[in-house]
Swiss-Prot record:
SUPFAM superfamilies: RmlC-like cupins. Binds either 1 Fe or Ni cation per monomer. Iron-binding promotes an acireductone dioxygenase reaction producing 2-keto-4-methylthiobutyrate, while nickel-binding promotes an acireductone dioxygenase reaction producing 3-(methylsulfanyl)propanoate. Pathway: Amino-acid biosynthesis; L-methionine biosynthesis via salvage pathway; L-methionine from S-methyl-5-thio-alpha-D-ribose 1-phosphate: step 5/6. Transmembrane segments: none annotated. It comes from the Eukaryota. It comes from Danio rerio (Zebrafish). Belongs to the acireductone dioxygenase (ARD) family. Its EC number is 1.13.11.54, 1.13.11.53. Monomer. Interacts with MMP14. GO terms for cellular component: cytoplasm; nucleus; plasma membrane. The gene is adi1. This is Acireductone dioxygenase.
Length: 181
């Protein structure tokens, strides 16, 4: 995967979550459709992430003051299988989720306004933001490897709220924002 790509998922398949799960025929999702639901993307040069002026500019503009790096691989992440299961549980956060893929590739799945799953393929150089309140999940692809920078506004909050979480104020705000965009 070298091109940023998104599509509606085949939700009926019980196959391995790490597979693409494209419908036949494929139903692509445009960048504009993603932006409509609050998902934004930048393509950066991950080889220079430590000194990248473009990344620094985005961090300053968005207030991303904290960052760390996570490596998701069976040999690098303790309790790998259970972590993958946890990441793949449908959930939301009270804050935006910001991830910058430094190496490898993976998928973010997000719900559209009609509650359909959209799969977003991310790979080296992709920086993606998911808005607070959006239902989503994450999985590696068949490579079983992703190294990502996690960015936060202020101190990191690691709490995920599994669905159903429709009574949360942040979820209500997110849903209301879809009607006004």
């Amino acid at each position: 995967m070298s091109v940023f790509e998104a599509w509606y998922m085949d939700e009926e398949s019980g196959e391995d979550q790490r597979l693409p799960h494209k419908l036949s025929p494929n139903q692509p999702v445009s960048v504009q459709q993603l932006e409509h639901i609050g998902v934004f993307h930048w393509k950066l040069n991950a080889d220079i992430y430590e000194n990248d002026p473009e990344l620094q500019k985005i961090r300053e503009e968005k207030g991303y003051s904290f960052m760390d790096i996570i490596t998701i691989h069976p040999d690098k992440l303790p309790d790998y299988q259970n972590k993958l299961k946890m990441f793949y549980e449908e959930h939301l956060h009270l804050d935006d989720e910001i991830r910058y893929i430094l190496e490898g590739s993976s998928y973010f799945d997000v719900r559209d306004e009609g509650d359909r799953w959209i799969r977003i393929a991310v790979s080296k150089g992709d920086l993606i933001t998911l808005p607070a309140g959006i239902y989503h999940r994450f999985t590696v692809d068949e490579s079983n490897y992703t190294k990502a920078m996690r960015l936060f506004v202020g101190e990191p909050v690691w709490k995920a709220y599994n669905r159903p979480a429709d009574d949360f104020d942040i979820r209500k705000e997110y849903v209301n924002s879809l009607g006004s965009s």
